[in-house]
From Swiss-Prot:
Chief place where the protein resides: mitochondrion
Species the sequence originates in: Mus musculus (Mouse)
Localization per record: Mitochondrion inner membrane
Entries under InterPro entries matching the protein: Mito_Carrier_Antiporter, Mitochondrial_sb/sol_carrier, Mt_carrier_dom_sf
Function field: Putative antiporter that exchanges dicarboxylates and sulfur oxoanions across the inner membrane of mitochondria.
Keywords, comma-separated and alphabetical: Membrane, Mitochondrion, Mitochondrion inner membrane, Repeat, Transmembrane, Transmembrane helix, Transport
Family: Belongs to the mitochondrial carrier (TC 2.A.29) family.
SUPFAM superfamilies: Mitochondrial carrier
Transmembrane annotation, as ranges: 38-58, 59-79, 91-119, 169-190, 205-225, 277-300
Membrane topology field: Multi-pass membrane protein
Gene for this chain: Slc25a35
Catalysed reactions listed for this entry: a dicarboxylate(in) + sulfate(out) = a dicarboxylate(out) + sulfate(in)
Protein name (Swiss-Prot/TrEMBL): Solute carrier family 25 member 35
Keyword Transport belongs to the record: yes
GO CC terms: mitochondrial inner membrane; mitochondrion
Length: 300
């Protein structure tokens, strides 16, 4: 039941935040491996990107990739949050005093994140391809021209096999390890602190909401460079064998980005990342916490 509730919670958040994921993806691909000031900026900021995409591609384009995004969230976060919740409910993450151990929470979050992300990697790759697709006048990054999720998965599988479907999976793991461990560690620790300080009534939904807000800030700062690199790894063009033509791996992507675009190139789209990850983290963790509380109350 933990896995089902976790997947449902993540999907609920995804419906609201997917347009921000589209904006974030395009801002991260804009000016790829080009020095600042040498390329046309189709998307100047989050709000301009929303306006531009809606105007040129149509309002429906703001929900591009929603199908694979929902499937990925259900698979990835169902496994990630479900596994973490199982470990938490059995007391593996607590100290002798009954509070969450930051080290154990971070380790459990990282391990759970790796399992979920690796399984869902082909879906995430196709989601990235679909969200990057745009009209030629505002296109950024490589354009794959997929017709949909199933067509894309079938085409990639036929051309490059399982290796092609899981291309970029290993390179995407540092993003998830850092993001998941930061998110779940800060969420659990802040919940403990708020409960100890008795700022809100015991078992109040405000505790989960406040902890999720803090967790959202932490995850964006820690994860954005790896998120930029991961997006580019998944979206890069490939040769006939399915091998990437621009980056050899996550470290190469980070180094090339920093060398060509500067330090802030690794933080491209951080505003969009927070507008997306902030609400997504808040909503998914809040829904997850409330569903678990409801289930535990009902089960008893």
């Amino acid at each position: 039941m933990d896995f089902l509730m976790s997947g449902v919670a993540a999907c609920g958040a995804c419906v609201f935040t997917n347009p921000l994921e589209v904006v974030k993806t395009r801002m991260q691909l804009q000016g790829e491996l080009q020095a600042p000031g040498t390329y046309q900026r189709h998307y100047r900021n989050v709000f301009h990107a929303f306006f531009t995409i809606g105007k040129v591609d149509g309002l429906a384009a703001l929900q591009k990739g929603l199908g694979p995004a929902l499937l990925y969230q259900f698979l990835m976060n169902g496994i990630r949050l479900g596994t973490y919740g199982l470990a938490e409910s059995r007391g593996y993450l607590h100290t002798n005093e009954g509070t969450h151990s930051p080290v154990r929470s971070a380790a459990a979050g990282a391990l759970a994140g790796v399992m979920g992300a690796y399984l869902g990697s082909p879906i995430y790759m196709v989601k990235t391809h679909l969200q990057a697709q745009a009209a030629s006048e505002i296109a950024v990054g490589h354009q794959y021209k997929h017709q949909g999720m199933f067509q894309a998965l079938t085409e990639i599988g036929q051309k490059h096999g399982l290796v092609g479907l899981w291309r970029g999976a290993v390179g995407g793991l540092p993003r998830v390890v850092i993001g998941s461990s930061t998110q779940l560690c800060t969420f659990s620790s802040i919940k403990d602190l708020l409960s100890q300080w008795e700022i809100f009534p015991p078992q109040s939904w405000k505790v989960a909401l406040a902890a999720a807000m803090v967790s959202g800030v932490a995850i964006v700062v820690a994860m954005t460079p790896f998120d930029v690199a991961s997006t580019r790894l998944y979206n890069q063009p490939t040769d006939t064998r399915g091998k990437g033509l621009m980056y050899r791996g996550i470290l190469d992507a980070l180094l090339q980005t920093a060398r060509t675009e500067g330090f802030f190139g690794m933080y491209k789209g951080i505003g969009a990342s927070y507008f997306r990850l902030g609400p997504h983290t808040i909503l998914s963790l809040f829904f997850w916490d409330q569903l678990r509380s409801f289930y535990n109350t009902y089960a008893k």
